[in-house]
């Protein structure tokens, strides 16, 4: 071939070869990416008009791209932000469930106590008048301690109720025996015989059982709602690892870099990314489900035998019945007290001229358990607990379900019906890898997210422990055992208020001065060695008191 022909053909062939490339460059314009990128609020100055070589990319495929280094960095941060918002949005239901139901239950309970105290005060003012008003602090202290217990105060319910009846006995004993003067020591002796004398009939024993188990259940339940609220709020605020952020960027915004801003991730691809990013949250699910089950058990108690509403509504009537029992048995009670504590000194003439008040004989209307009032919180306990139970059941398995819930969102993925025209991490095609199981240990072979299965998230483990502790307290409350929410360091305190003697097996015989007054600190226990010594000295002291009493009797 002549040289001049070769000189003409070769440039022409080179020109023809470049024509498809030029057409291809025009087809790979970044105009769609520019529009989508600008809609995110980013500056268009970052983005080229046409694809450029992608050797600078650190996350997306290093092919021809519409992304600069600055774009990849910004879109990486955007993917992190969107992921955090998605998790918080997806867990919104469980968070609002615990926040709103805790608020309702707390309002209901506090108002129930306020109404019960007001009802008792109104009834006793009408019935006993000045006598009640002069001794009203005994009843005010009862409700103050009940409120303090409910709010987490270190109150032993049994000790507190025993103290209430002992104080009431002291006041009543003076009122039915106005002809005598009683010293503080004598009244202290009187109070020691509350259990043995049963001056108030069987009301204190029954009320103690009802109040303790109802308050234990109610307080533990509201504490459970608090813990659930706090755990849900904390876990919903995720901090993705660097490996997770890379996977999120690759899934959500590498399509932009490939010039495919409208192509969304494949559903299964999304699941693997989310399971890797939320592996620790999924591990929370087991303990969370046990916690929800325990909450449901206590809720059943609140609906049934531990119903705080059925205990507090008629408490004024029950206490008034106890007072009438005391009035009816006043002579027998006084005789036994005089026998055990000695004959009191006569009162001055002016005071002894007064007789025992007649108005203790007033009878009250019987309480109708069918009268289930609603409070300003807007409901009765039955309806409130039923509503809470329904919401609790819906919150089970919420943490392991997060990846599925997020990946069902049409804003995130192409959906399960479009498995061919979706982004698989490299191109627009079907996603082939298998879906990982839930939990940290199952992510060892996750193809999308680098997960160190040997290093569980410390923060999530703390939430698991908080749930475990609360579940144990709920189980105790279900069985009627008290739980100390403030100070759990003293293991010698056992199960607190719920571990006392509340059944018919308790001693009921009247005894002379061999019963100690309630301890000031219910959590403090004497050592066994010192207890045995004290028991011996107490027996000796009892014998001395018996001799003195007999001498006085036959003098």
Swiss-Prot record:
Residues 1-23 form the signal peptide. One of its GO terms (biological process) is cell migration. It is a lipid-anchor; GPI-anchor. Keywords: Cell membrane, Glycoprotein, GPI-anchor, Heparan sulfate, Lipoprotein, Membrane, Proteoglycan, Secreted, Signal. It comes from the Eukaryota. InterPro entries: Glypican (IPR001863), Glypican_CS (IPR019803). A lipid is attached at residue 530 (GPI-anchor amidated serine). In the cartilage growth-plate, gradient of expression with highest levels from the proliferative and pre-hypertrophic zones to lowest, if any, in the hypertrophic zones (at protein level). Residues 348-376, 480-501 are annotated as: Disordered. It holds the Pfam family Glypican. Residues 531-555 form a propeptide. GO terms for cellular component: extracellular region; Golgi lumen; plasma membrane; side of membrane; synapse. Residues 348-357 have a biased composition (Low complexity). It is found in: Cell membrane. Belongs to the glypican family. Cell surface proteoglycan that bears heparan sulfate. Putative cell surface coreceptor for growth factors, extracellular matrix proteins, proteases and anti-proteases. Enhances migration and invasion of cancer cells through WNT5A signaling. This is Glypican-6. It comes from Mus musculus (Mouse). The gene is Gpc6.
